[in-house]
Amino acid sequence: MDLQQDQWWSNFKNDENAVLLDVRTEDEVSEGAIPNAVHHDFYQGQDFLTALENLDKSKNYYVYCRSGNRSGQTCLLMNQLGFENTYNLVGGMNEWNGPTV
């Protein structure tokens, strides 16, 4: 599900079953990330798919990338893999004005 920043962040902060998932490259992550995010690089092909398959399907995933494109694709892929609750950050880090590390 695509969510705008305010709704995405509010939902995440109030979700006790939430996991932040950053699907950007290492170079992008080095420029700043949302605190406590789990990182799996979208461009790692089979390794990325394997990493997704090994995630806990009972969790709620708040997924982001640089622009919202890769994270949107990741949410669709996760849904196909049996994840029920995935939330894409529309605009990604390009439009993020929340906390970073």
Show which residues each predicted segment covers.
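Rhodanese-like catalytic fold shared by cysteine-dependent sulfurtransferases
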Residues: 1-19, 26-60, 66-101
